[in-house]
Amino acid sequence: MAKKANDLTGKEWLQNSFSIWRDLKKTAEEKKMNHPASYPVALCEKLIKTFSRSDCRVLDPFNGIGSTMVAAKNLNCSGLGIDLSTEFCEIANERIDGAPNISVINGDSFKVLKDSNIGEFDICITSPPYWDILNMKRSADGKVSVNYSDEGSDLGNLSDYEYFLTQLKELFSLVYNRLKPDSYCLINVMDIRKKSEFYPLHSDLAYKLREIGFVFDDLIIWDRQSDYNNMRPLGYPYRFRINKVHEYILIMHKK
C-alpha cells in the first residue's frame, strides 16, 4: 500500500491546493521581532502539513529568527536551523525554548551542510536573501535599508546578480544532498526591481535548481497585500510600475 503524502483530510487537501494562499499573516508578536525579512510560523506550519508528515525532520539553511523551527516544534517534528547571525540565532533559541530534537547552529550553511554528521532531512523550508535588496531603500513604501549582516559569506551582500544565483545554486546543491528521496524543498522568494531593471528571481532560481537535479514541481503565490498599508503610486505620472504585494513559494522536488 502506498504511503500517504501527508496527514491532511480531503477538505484540507482541497483548500491547500489552491494556488494563491491568502490566510497567512504575522501575529502581533511576530511583527515586533527585530528581523528585516521574517515570515510567519503559520506559513511554515501549512507547508509542513501539506508536503510532509508530523514525524518529519525539517531543514532551514537561512533560519533567521527561527520561524521554520518554531513550526517544526509546534507540529512535534525535529529540525535543524542554520544562520550566520548570532543575534538572530539567540532569538531563535529563545523561541524554540529548549524543544527536544530541534537545533539551531550559528554558522555558515555552506560549511555546516558539508558535515555528514547532520544526517538527512524529510523537507527543507527556507527563504534565502532576496539578493542585496535589504541594503537598498524601498521605493514602494519608503522604508529604509536594513543590513542583515556584514559577513563576507552573507549572500545578501553580493552585488552581482549572476554570481548571487550561482552561489544559491551551490548552497541548494548541498541541501539536495541532505534531503531524502521523494522530498520537497520549499523556497520563499520575491521578484526584484532595481530602477529600470526587473529581475524574475523566482524563475531564475527555479531553473538554476533544476540544473542540480530538483524537479520544478509547481509554485504557490503568497498574497501579502494585507501586510502593506503605506504604498505609493510607483512611477506616477511618468511610467507605470507594479507594486508587488505577493511572494512565491517554489515547490522543488527531489525524486
Predicted regions and their residues:
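Class I S-adenosyl-L-methionine-dependent methyltransferase catalytic core
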Residues: 1-255
